[in-house]
Every structure is written in structure tokens, then in C-alpha cells.
Design a protein with these regions (language model features):
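A structural signal for multi-pass alpha-helical bundles of membrane permease subunits
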Residues: 1-194
């Protein structure tokens, strides 16, 4: 039992546990929330729908290490990154994301990677919804918001459960994104249990 006692009394363990829970919870909220909204949006016909869907699912096919390197050096770098250039263009000081907001940076990267998965599952569920239900609701005077909350969202319940379950399994073992971008730092700011 000495090992368990050491684990429970180790402050690094508790910081890592909290970081893991924050990472998993935040990514789930972002991917399920945005995935649901994008699924409803992509269910509507619009010009270039096929290309838009292809671009929306593309991040899922990028390796985690490559994704982390792209975000670290191309997007979030304070001097050479797109976000730094955008900040300077708007007259603000560029933000060193990985030094000032390490956990938020990792959450954004991992959310960007897992949003396509949630979108695919939820879009499939939205497309399986019978149009007669929506039409009947429309004839009864239900607006778009009422249709979303009383027809679409309840229909997505099982799909949302699947997304949460599968993403949780994989998010508990996120390692590459953290190691490549922050190495768990500064200090223990982005260290997780993996």
C-alpha cells in the first residue's frame, strides 16, 4: 500500500488529474456543442456543400504530432503565427499561447482534431431524422428553434452519447499534442495523467 499512499499524497498527481478532467470535459463540450450546430448547418442544402463537408472532416485525418506542430509553429507562434499576425494587424500585442495559456492551447488543438469525428456521427444522426416529423412540427407552427430543441436534439441523444463515450476513451490518453507543444509545462500547467 506504500505505492498508493505515495500516489495519493503526491501533489503532481492531483494537478495532473485536474488537468485531465479539464481537458476531457472542455473538449467534449466544444466538440459536442459545435458538432451539433455544424451537423444541423451541413444538413441544409447550400452551394459547395460537398467541398465544405470534405474540409470540415479533414482535420481528423491529420496525425496528432503533425497537428500539434502546425498549431505550435504556424498558428499560435507569437511572431510567425497566423494568430500573432492577426493580433498585430488589429493593433494588439501578440499572445504567446503556450506560455500564457498552455491548457487552453492544448484544448483548442485537441478540439480541432476531434470536432470532425463528432460532426460525422451527429450529421449522420441528423440525416436519419424523418422529414415528416419536421414537416408536422412546421405545420403545427413550430419555428426553427422549437424544432431544434424538441425534435432534432432529442433525436441526437444516442449519437451524442456515442460521441461522448468514444471521445472520452481516446481523450484520456492524449499525449502527443501536449508533449510536442508544452511538454506538460510551464510547470504542471498542462500535464495530464497520460
Amino acid at each position: 500500500f506504500d505505492n498508493y499512499e505515495f500516489l495519493v499524497t503526491d501533489p503532481d498527481f492531483w494537478a495532473s488529474l485536474v488537468n485531465t478532467l479539464v481537458l476531457v470535459g472542455s473538449v467534449l463540450v466544444i466538440t459536442v456543442g459545435l458538432g451539433t450546430l455544424l451537423a444541423v448547418l451541413y444538413d441544409q442544402p447550400f452551394p459547395g456543400q460537398g467541398v465544405a463537408r470534405l474540409l470540415a472532416i479533414a482535420p481528423f485525418f491529420v496525425m496528432p504530432t503533425v497537428s500539434a506542430l502546425v498549431w505550435k509553429n504556424l498558428m499560435m507562434h507569437p511572431i510567425y503565427g497566423v494568430l500573432g499576425a492577426l493580433s498585430r494587424g488589429l493593433g494588439f500585442e501578440p499572445v504567446d499561447w503556450f506560455a500564457e495559456y498552455p491548457m487552453l492551447s492544448v484544448i483548442l488543438i485537441v478540439s480541432w482534431q476531434w470536432l470532425p469525428f463528432a460532426l460525422l456521427i451527429l450529421l449522420t444522426a441528423v440525416q436519419s431524422l424523418d422529414n415528416e416529423q419536421k414537416e408536422a412540427a412546421r405545420m403545427d407552427g413550430a419555428g426553427a428553434v422549437a424544432q431544434f430543441f424538441f425534435i432534432t436534439l432529442p433525436h441526437l441523444g444516442r449519437a451524442i452519447s456515442v460521441v461522448i463515450m468514444i471521445e472520452t476513451i481516446f481523450l484520456l490518453s492524449v499525449f502527443a499534442e501536449i508533449y510536442v507543444t508544452t511538454s506538460g509545462g510551464p510547470g504542471l500547467a498542462s500535464t495530464n495523467l497520460a
